[in-house]
């Protein structure tokens, strides 16, 4: 028998490190207590089985969560707090990085910002000539399946902060991150407009449910 099996999540974490915890144990660590019928580990396991994953659980809305037996407003607040803490962590990490040396940092930040949006949002990260983040903005918002993007507005914002480069991103609320022909055409327009002002477009990421597509990785930029 694995000697870690009889340890509670907190003790296991302190002895073996946070990475040793399973998803069930990590969730139980935050929930702290279970219900009248289930201990915290059994309850955490039941929640993950019901929703299918940590992502689905933390993305669920209030009605979906409080419909679960034993999950009242207190636990709802805990779960939403965990999700918001993660989102703010990635946001602060992006801003405080000396430079964007890791594409995964950018991707994780954008996923934390856009995955749960119910309509299309177009974001831009503005960078200096050393790839340090100057600012990030949600410049355009649209409908469930479309967002109108104005390349000149992107350039105008870039000039305001003296940006040397930008990273584009938008989400697909439908779940599939596969870029449409319209996505490719607007990206080409933004690239041309930025190039005229000597601003580099490093990438355009399309964010779906648990997946993404990078224009740079596909060789489209």
Curated annotation (Swiss-Prot):
UniProt cross-references to Pfam families, sorted A to Z: RadC (PF04002), UPF0758_N (PF20582)
> A Gene Ontology molecular-function term?
metal ion binding
SS bond list: none
Chain segments annotated as coiled-coil in the UniProt record: none
Domain MPN intervals: 99-221
Extract the InterPro entries matched here.
MPN, RadC_JAB, RuvA_2-like, UPF0758, UPF0758_CS, UPF0758_N, UPF0758_YicR
Residue window of motif JAMM motif: 170-183
Top-level division of the source organism's lineage: Bacteria
Keyword tags: Hydrolase, Metal-binding, Metalloprotease, Protease, Zinc
Annotated family: Belongs to the UPF0758 family. YicR subfamily.
Q: Which named protein is this?
A: UPF0758 protein KPK_0116
Taxonomic path: Bacteria, Pseudomonadati, Pseudomonadota, Gammaproteobacteria, Enterobacterales
